[in-house]
Amino acid sequence: MADSSFDVVSKVDRQEVDNALHQAAKELTTRFDFRNTGASIEWSGEETITLNADTEERLLAALDVFKEKLIRRDISLKAFDAGEPAQSGKIYKLSGTLVQGISSENAKKITKKIRDEGPKGVKAQIQGEELRVSSKKRDDLQGVISLLKGEDFGIALQFVNYR
């Protein structure tokens, strides 16, 4: 019998992020406490989202609105890395990036965790920005999934291609 396997990836559905961004932008224009504060949210590039507001408090409130919309769309907040608010003239700006892909150091941490605490006979291979986990037994793979879900690696993990 062939080995069973699955892939560990860290990807974000760009369309869902776009929907969350548009919902947040609409809420910023219609909510009473954001009137005349210059609060806005927009894409600036492929992976970067920029928030603007007149005061730092309104900027952080706009960030909370955006995070709430991400949560409602089932997007992990670990996938959005918000920077620090910076003042640019009279306007406060905050740039955040979408975190996609598993970095090499995180991949090494995950493989070490699987090797040390996972069931025997489970192999983990780094393949670019994803990780392939394989074993003869499917039960071992499910044990690895629950092991990885219980650990915090600082990134949003998804488990795909379960065969």
Curated annotation (Swiss-Prot):
InterPro entries: DUF520, UPF0234-like_C, UPF0234_N, YajQ-like_sf. PANTHER family: UPF0234 PROTEIN YAJQ (PTHR30476:SF0). One of its GO terms (molecular function) is nucleotide binding. This is Nucleotide-binding protein RER_17110. One of its GO terms (cellular component) is cytosol. Keywords: Nucleotide-binding. HAMAP family: YajQ (MF_00632). Nucleotide-binding protein. Belongs to the YajQ family.
